[in-house]
Amino acid sequence: MSNMQQTTGYVYANELLQYRFSNKHPFNQMRLKLTTELLMELGQLKQHHIISPRIATDDELSLIHAYDYIQAIRHASHGILSENEAKKYGLDGEDTLQFRMMHKHSARIVGGALNLADQIMSGTLTNGCHLGGGLHHSLPGRANGFCIYNDVAITISYLMQKYNQRVLCIDTDAHHGDGTQWSFYTNDQALIYSIHETGKFLFPGSGHYTERGAEKGFGYTVNIPLEPYTEDQSFLDVFKQTIEPVVASFKPDIIVSVHGVDVHYLDPLTHMSCTLNTLYEIPYIVKSLADTYTQGKVIMFGGGGYNIWKVVPRAWSHVFLALIGEQPPTGSLPERWLTKWQPYATCTLPTNWSDDKENYIEIPRRKEISEINMKQAQKVLSWFE
């Protein structure tokens, strides 16, 4: 399929920035605005790409979430959720806090994904991204890991039920996408593939390779847990070697992918040692798989990524650039973007597209880590021989 035939959507509205737990919370949607403006200054993101989100309906939310949970989020939006209910629904800790109008702002993220899905399925668009989404930890009846409504899981269910699609989810966030996995654990119409930092040391503690699905869904969950301090070469080797046979075996109609960028060595919440090289390459790999197996149909979500100044805007820009068929840029970042945002930044902004390897430490256990990771890959590959 030539680039001229492809049309790409980019979900954005300033209202998406209102999904905010507190001013000090690490989940900061300002990263979405930074990425959007970087792409615009680059001259690649145009107004015709923009897909406006909407507020998802309760029926749409209930494709995954329990009715009582949705009502609890509504109550929390107005500050009338009891202490016992807050504990029951996962809203009593410091990770996933209650905030005003949280139902509306969370449902808007879901609605953006569904608008994009409809336009792809109608043929108006070939592909698209929703970098403000990717809330893959939320469980059917419980908030979890900064996530209220699981827009990834809802989109998968929506594509399955409304359009009868076989959906492959590729999740490369450093944290295992537990909410998405458990939502489809007994289903054989969705395959959930996740490559992530091992749950031995990182939230949510799940994603072991033995978690393969259950009942008719057995074999439709694929987990690749990686060792802490995994670097570019090992990550990409394992990813490339395992994802192709998974896709070829499952034969999806559409791909949904989660592009958390928290495997970067500067991310404050994880223990991985990848650079921008890995984060730049991943969306191009996923795009190539979509072109080969799904006539180009793919929805790319954001996800984790908590160094919002030095990592996320540059990394997420490549999600959109991959979708429109542009090669990764080189050289300096747009001067206007740097000039606008440096006064607000909590650090000195990077001035070019490449990592300067600031504070990067060569990992002494590189060989050992790579061997452990490849053993995990071999176990998974044996299932698809």
From Swiss-Prot:
One of its GO terms (biological process) is epigenetic regulation of gene expression. SUPFAM superfamilies: Arginase/deacetylase (SSF52768). One of its GO terms (molecular function) is histone deacetylase activity. Keywords: Acetoin catabolism. Belongs to the histone deacetylase family. Role in growth on acetoin or butanediol. Involved in the breakdown of these compounds used as a carbon source. PANTHER family: HISTONE DEACETYLASE HDAC1, HISTONE DEACETYLASE HDAC1-RELATED. This is Acetoin utilization protein AcuC. The lineage of its organism: Bacteria, Bacillati, Bacillota, Bacilli, Bacillales.
